Design a protein with these regions (language model features):
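Hydrophobic alpha-helical bundles in membrane proteins
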Residues: 15-239
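Basic, Lys/Arg-rich alpha-helical nucleic-acid-recognition elements, primarily the DNA-binding modules
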Residues: 1-13
Length: 239
């Protein structure tokens, strides 16, 4: 009897369906994640960066020396925002279609073939140092992103400089998010194959039980927000 089967019986899950994962499947899954991780991170970064042009042009339109009308600033800024969001959504869809084949890795119980766990552990050990480095860079960028904003508050009250500081904040957050998403995607894939960290069988089953109530909660919260906002027409406060 394999170790995976013993573990399955020990956890009292013999009646649950278990997906078999061969060495070939594990390697293919890791290759797909390696291919999509950077692209997904880049798309996420584009979403965060998308309003920067709109914000900057809006601030520049308030400055007479830039000779940019509000309509031109809004038109160009919104066009850039839509294009960047469209590119990001396209990337998300392509990556989602590529990884859909193995989406059960995150939510369902799996049983790996002989040698798979050892192979994945070796890859995870080799990736640990780059993972920590990227995570530290990402978190540091996110923490430091508020420095331009508070620095500007300390030395100037100009709206233009404040908007510029917000744009710098978004840029640093985007860079940090890129490193965090990229590194986390690869590490999570290996943890999924090993059923460790956030992907143990117990946590998978707990997440399944919680998914229904969480969805209901957000639907109710959204309905209350929209009803309140439409009723009072006080959108600048209800959010």
């Amino acid at each position: 009897e394999s170790a995976a089967s013993k573990r399955k019986k020990k956890e009292g899950e013999s009646d649950r369906s278990v997906h078999k994962v061969t060495m070939e499947m594990a390697n293919e899954y890791l290759q797909i994640i390696d291919w999509s991780a950077g692209k997904t991170a880049f798309a996420t970064m584009l979403c965060i960066l998308s309003p920067i042009v709109l914000l900057m042009l809006g601030a520049m339109s308030e400055m007479p020396n830039y000779h940019i009308s509000e309509n031109a600033a809004a038109g160009i800024g919104i066009c850039v925002l839509i294009v960047l969001i469209a590119i990001a959504v396209t990337i998300f869809i392509l990556c989602g279609m590529k990884t859909k084949k193995y989406e059960y890795m995150e939510k369902e119980d799996i049983e790996t073939a002989y040698g798979v766990s050892g192979m994945v552990k070796e890859k995870r050990d080799a990736y640990h140092s780059p993972y920590v480095t990227q995570l530290v860079i990402g978190i540091t960028c996110c923490i430091c992103s508020v420095i331009p904003l508070f620095g500007t508050l300390a030395v100037s009250e100009s709206d233009f400089y404040m908007v510029s500081a917000v744009c710098m904040l978004l840029t640093l957050v985007a860079i940090g998010t890129y490193f965090i998403v990229r590194s986390a995607a690869k590490m999570n894939a290996m943890n999924q194959l090993l059923e460790e960290e956030d992907y143990t069988r117990q946590k998978k089953h707990e997440n399944k039980k919680m998914s229904g109530p969480v969805m209901v909660y957000w639907l109710i919260a959204t309905a209350i927000y929209l009803a309140w906002s439409f009723t009072t027409n006080d959108w600048d406060r209800t959010w």
